[in-house]
């Protein structure tokens, strides 16, 4: 799969050819996770509506839920104003985090609301 050249031209990638992907739950607005994508992962996501990311540690693409069953059905993809981050709005099935938690941001609260 190849990325539309018009979209590819707008992306700003790091030295490894990657850009950040923030994944948000449709309906609740909760941020579920942050991962990396390359052009091919974004192209696959846009074509299949299955969230596909790039693993820096394994050096390969992975489809969310392919092994765990914790899938992400993509409803929309937005590019930020700088072109270096995409926002995926998804329906999450199961946990988004590799720990099994619904979101990767349940672990530690560093600063809470003013009381």
Curated annotation (Swiss-Prot):
Binds 1 Mg(2+) ion per subunit. It is found in: Cytoplasm. This is Phosphoribosyl-AMP cyclohydrolase. PANTHER family: HISTIDINE BIOSYNTHESIS BIFUNCTIONAL PROTEIN, PHOSPHORIBOSYL-AMP CYCLOHYDROLASE. One of its GO terms (cellular component) is cytoplasm. It comes from Mycolicibacterium smegmatis (strain ATCC 700084 / mc(2)155) (Mycobacterium smegmatis). Its main location: cytoplasm. Homodimer. GO terms for biological process: L-histidine biosynthetic process. The lineage of its organism: Bacteria, Bacillati, Actinomycetota, Actinomycetes, Mycobacteriales. GO terms for molecular function: magnesium ion binding; phosphoribosyl-AMP cyclohydrolase activity; zinc ion binding. Pfam families: PRA-CH (PF01502). Its cofactor is Mg(2+); Zn(2+). The gene is hisI.
